[in-house]
Amino acid sequence: MIPGEIIPVQGDIELNKGLPTVTLKVANSGDRPIQVGSHYHFFETNEGLKFDREQTRGMRLDIAAGTAMRFEPGQERDVTLVPLGGKREVYGFQQKVMGKL
């Protein structure tokens, strides 16, 4: 091995394997694009995004870490969410939870 060398695993890597998912329609009702990061508590996203919020409590986007999803004005799309991991505590964001889920 050479220092700093990266030896990738053979085959595909499946993200969030085995986690329960929720898929729902999300629409941007605003006049500006809205971007949501991979680990943002989806329940607390911008109010310009219209969807069934209660279904998303404790959930995040099912996308690769460090990436984001952008919703253009007037755009509607299906999104898939997975549960937040760890201690299942949420602090910050829009301060709608501030504790255990």
UniProtKB/Swiss-Prot annotation:
Pfam families annotated for this entry?
Urease_beta (PF00699)
- Keywords assigned by UniProt, alphabetized: Cytoplasm, Hydrolase
- UniProt catalytic activity: urea + 2 H2O + H(+) = hydrogencarbonate + 2 NH4(+)
Q: Which GO terms describe its molecular function?
A: urease activity
Write down the superkingdom of origin: Bacteria
What broad class of enzyme is this? hydrolase
Kindly give the InterPro entries that the UniProt entry links to this protein. Answer: Urease_beta-like (IPR002019), Urease_betasu_sf (IPR036461), Urease_subunit (IPR050069)
Principal location listed in the UniProt entry: cytoplasm
Q: Which PANTHER family match?
A: UREASE
Q: Which family does it belong to?
A: Belongs to the urease beta subunit family.
Subunit structure comment from the entry: Heterotrimer of UreA (gamma), UreB (beta) and UreC (alpha) subunits. Three heterotrimers associate to form the active enzyme.
Q: What is this protein called?
A: Urease subunit beta
**Organism phylogeny:** Bacteria, Pseudomonadati, Pseudomonadota, Alphaproteobacteria, Hyphomicrobiales
